[in-house]
């Protein structure tokens, strides 16, 4: 036997190469998580473009309110002024020059996402500017003023009564069904991403948000 010939280890090395495991695709984010990430990036861009420059550590509830007012230029919800003939009418019969604003429901949902994103990014609940009392008061004022201007009251949905409490064979009345259907509706802009794709530039215009 020729000692210079290929040994067992050489034969193994010359075999078929091992197949590397395919990398696992990244987990797809939910719609909420994707929206939250876009909103957070938009707010950070707003801070970078702020004049004078503003860091997240120095951001306060007043700056958050300033951001919400800035977003109004991208709004799609008609909010009638007190002197408008259509003030308080939910379905005005014609056009008017009143401004478009971000709907209260959109702003409320936006603040909820930004509040969560702030703490997920390392911020503490105590220093969270999106949870500031001033922000809550501002949102309440927006809700009340838009409810009066648009003639659409914002009421909390009442919990449905247990079906077990009703006598057997008795169905809910038509009025109750209609009320439940009405309670399920609301502002078309509620829960939308007010700042989803906004190019945040405090001093100028940007791309309109995906919903208002």
UniProtKB/Swiss-Prot annotation:
Q: Where is the composition biased (Low complexity)?
A: 1-22, 167-182, 195-212
Instruction: Give GO BP annotations, semicolon-separated.
Output: mRNA transcription; post-embryonic plant morphogenesis; response to light stimulus
As given in the record, the signal peptide range reads none
Query: Where does this protein have compositionally biased stretches of type Gly residues?
Result: 183-194
- For this chain the motif Nuclear localization signal maps to 156-160
A Pfam family annotated for this chain is: ALOG_dom
All disulfide bonds of the chain are: none
Main subcellular location of this protein, as a coarse class: nucleus
GO cellular component term, pick one: nucleus
Transmembrane spans: none
Taking every annotated instance into account, which residue ranges of this chain make up the domain ALOG? 31-158
Region of interest (Disordered), residue spans = 1-34, 148-212
Subcellular localization, as worded in the UniProt entry = Nucleus
Function field = Probable transcription regulator that acts as a developmental regulator by promoting cell growth in response to light.
Q: Which family does it belong to?
A: Belongs to the plant homeotic and developmental regulators ALOG protein family.
Can you name this protein? Protein G1-like7
Q: Which organism is it from?
A: Oryza sativa subsp. japonica (Rice)
Task: Identify the gene encoding this protein.
Answer: G1L7
